[in-house]
């Protein structure tokens, strides 16, 4: 049976919006636009993603904290460039009860301005560095564009942010490399191939020295940013007076970095791995990795259900998340429900399987079925789950790579966007004026230049298609979410 991805590719927006509700991820009907209710199944998946993030944070020496959601306007105003980047997006708290507040408060859009006044109290000596903390919290941004669950929302409810402070620019750079390694581990855990780009000056995070963004390719040829890393140098340290005493007794400002992700990670998983039947979850994050569907006949119900429960218990003991569907409905309806929810592997057992000590494994990613011996069930299930994960990654990698096109002219770039969208790589002189002109002509956003920067150098002899000067870089453009 062939996997169908017609609606997934041709009418992605409708497919995605329907699936978010029918698969039990979120309910969009909450009476505040852009703020959605997490449903139990969706939250379980997100918690499995976060479990991996927590483990990576622990492995790399980050400590978890939890800051208040309200930030005084006086703290928010300390970093001018940061305010300029966020002032149109913040929610203001102006009253306590009926009384106007002396100092207005904002609901955090991100936590730099909340955290760094405390950093200036906590960091005193070179012995306190490197200082590495993180939190997963709700943040609030007044999005004026069209909202979409998990992708563009006004309450980002699973916002991960790691903040670090260092005694030198070089150590901060080492932290960025560690962030990239953590992100790569997470992306493999989610079977998500991605690209990293260094953002252009006009699109870096407000207050950053430079910003990196991780993008994935969505089914409609648009890109989705699912992670960011920023090196702040000493920009925020000077605004918030975060200094430390050196070994020689001098005082220096710290160097800072941040690393951020959100529930867009789950949006990417749903979008990239799905098909016309619904979600296809990587086994690593599926709340149920294996569903067992008993298919009894009237005279064999007790034996078939007992056999299904026996297999489930053995899989559970082996650490596999398993569920036996004993609902009194037709097997076909059960298949439909679990395929919609993206359960990676289905085991079907009937009277013949009980008699022959066998079971049928049905893969969600390929819809293929194989019959296996009951005695080898744990080994076969593990092997199949690993194969599903690897297949999801390779399929998504091929999709991403097939949607990256290198061109030399604006006309060629336009043709790519008209044909299939995706990512266009084009020579660029490095001047902001030319970059903005290309954004305008292509009706696309410059993602930046490939990172690490040795990948970003333009081949010799290439010209910027706007000004005709020698190209310094290869720049990436895409239509984005």
Curated annotation (Swiss-Prot):
Gene3D superfamilies reported in the protein's UniProt record: Anticodon-binding domain, Bira Bifunctional Protein, Domain 2, C-terminal domain of ProRS
CDD domains given in the database record: ProRS_anticodon_zinc, ProRS_core_arch_euk
EC identifiers of the protein: 6.1.1.15
UniProt entry keywords in alphabetical sequence: Aminoacyl-tRNA synthetase, ATP-binding, Cytoplasm, Ligase, Nucleotide-binding, Protein biosynthesis
Subcellular location(s) per record: Cytoplasm
GO molecular function, one term: ATP binding
Record keyword Ligase present: yes
Pfam families cross-referenced by the UniProt entry: HGTP_anticodon (PF03129), ProRS-C_1 (PF09180), tRNA-synt_2b (PF00587)
Name by which UniProt lists this protein: Proline--tRNA ligase
Species per Swiss-Prot/TrEMBL record: Thermococcus kodakarensis (strain ATCC BAA-918 / JCM 12380 / KOD1)
Gene: proS
